[in-house]
């Protein structure tokens, strides 16, 4: 047991950089010293106070940001439709809601998340006993790549929007930095989930690779046994043919060969009717090829190499298969616990991604029509910045959905690999073992969902893509209808004003005519 503990590398050892950044940002409340010294995530009262303080600070700064840049929002309702105003008001706070959901969930689960990674460490020890050594160095590289990509996307969106679309001549414009805090914190939180999910997928694949290795080893063992069996010597075309009564009709067709010539030619090497050499036994000059000069047949495959197979002994391999299935069940339970810990943050992220993707495209359309848009969505005024924002937002959602789907597929593939062991061994006892374990594996697969509302798989991604397209078309149609109604009202008001002016002018003409008639009548002397 001590040897397994020394050989197994803790998974949390690869989270050093991510933990320090998350701790400074106020995402995790766990104790810093215990993680640095023993790679453990344990509760911390000071960490909880620091996390709540940063949460309150972020909320206050975000509201100050909205108030400072809200001049455009206050004039938005008067200049645009109520639909655009309501959408902008709701989506202005959805990023803040997502950030609060991430931090409060981390605060609630601060004790359970440490237990989760401890269970993963115990799984690694059990896999090590079965010959599966997990290499966690790839996880460390993935974390660094994700952190670098996060910084690049956040800085690209923040700097480009600040330079092109914000009046940075005023000192209040520095508050625009606060607009990047919710998405940055959300991304750091989702890196924890994504990397942990990837670690589970690697362990499923390690079990599948072990079962596939058993199958390959047994196939090599069968080839080795087949190679040691006696193989009949190859036919030599230089020797005279032996008589076969079943081929008598063929002998008559090949030059009138009689039955007696076969026996004589076998003894003396000559005969009256001798079958001419076939084409592949002659060279290009029509000369017979010497049998001694031909290339000898290849030797049997690895006849001097001994291949042992665990599947050849059903009683011996039963314990290994049982252990692998138990580890598989434990990984599935860890996956369910992981999904439960991040269920609300995943739901908020998917809702945020769906709404922001649709709204960003809608506000891009509004910007092309020279309409006012909410202040925090001013990035939609620039198509290049819009592409970066959409790539960043959709990339997080799509990657988590894809990784969840691949992890679920890897868990279900274990049953296929297990059945291959039974098929290649062709042993009744092993068949019974495989069938018994397969019944257990039916309940071991894991599926990831967002609070049970929808499953994180490719079908959901396809449905979300169609929903974004449909709602975007509906919003554009509503916007067109609102603009047409506004233009109609303006036209009607202008016609009323014109009609009023015409009526006033007509009345003035009538008054002038009446006054002229009165003066004329009064001033004219009576005859």
Swiss-Prot record:
Gene Ontology biological process terms in this record: chemosensory behavior; detection of chemical stimulus involved in sensory perception of bitter taste; detection of chemical stimulus involved in sensory perception of taste; male courtship behavior; monoatomic ion transmembrane transport; response to caffeine; response to insecticide; response to L-canavanine
Annotated TM spans:
47-67, 81-101, 145-165, 175-195, 346-366, 383-403, 461-481
List the stretches on the Cytoplasmic face of the membrane: 1-46, 102-144, 196-345, 404-460
Q: Where in the cell is it found?
A: Cell membrane
Q: Which tissues is this protein detected in according to the database? A: Taste hairs in labial palps, labral and cibarial sense organs and forelegs. In larvae, is expressed in neurons of the terminal external chemosensory organ, as well as in the dorsal, ventral, and posterior pharyngeal sense organs.
**Recorded topology in the membrane:** Multi-pass membrane protein
GO molecular function annotations of the record: ionotropic taste receptor activity; ligand-gated monoatomic ion channel activity; taste receptor activity
Topology Extracellular: residue spans: 68-80, 166-174, 367-382, 482-527
Where are glycans found on this sequence?
496, 510
Summarize what gene deletion causes.
Disrupts fly aversion to caffeine, N,N-Diethyl-meta-toluamide (DEET), and L-canavanine.
Keyword annotations: Cell membrane, Glycoprotein, Membrane, Receptor, Transducer, Transmembrane, Transmembrane helix
Entries under Pfam families matching the protein? 7tm_7 (PF08395)
Q: Which domain of life is it from?
A: Eukaryota
> Gene Ontology cellular component?
axon; dendrite; membrane; neuronal cell body; plasma membrane
Q: Which InterPro entries match?
A: 7TM_chemorcpt
| Main location as per UniProt | membrane
Q: Which PANTHER family match?
A: GUSTATORY RECEPTOR FOR BITTER TASTE 66A (PTHR21143:SF128), INVERTEBRATE GUSTATORY RECEPTOR (PTHR21143)
Q: Which family does it belong to?
A: Belongs to the insect chemoreceptor superfamily. Gustatory receptor (GR) family. Gr66a subfamily.
| Function of the molecule | Gustatory receptor required for response to the bitter in taste neurons. Gr66a cells respond to bitter compounds such as caffeine, theophylline, threonine or valine. Flies avoid bitter substances, suggesting that Gr66a neuron activity is sufficient to mediate avoidance behavior. Required for sensing and avoiding N,N-Diethyl-meta-toluamide (DEET), the most widely used insect repellent worldwide, as well as to L-canavanine, a plant-derived insecticide.
Output this protein's name.
Gustatory receptor for bitter taste 66a
Q: Which organism is it from?
A: Drosophila melanogaster
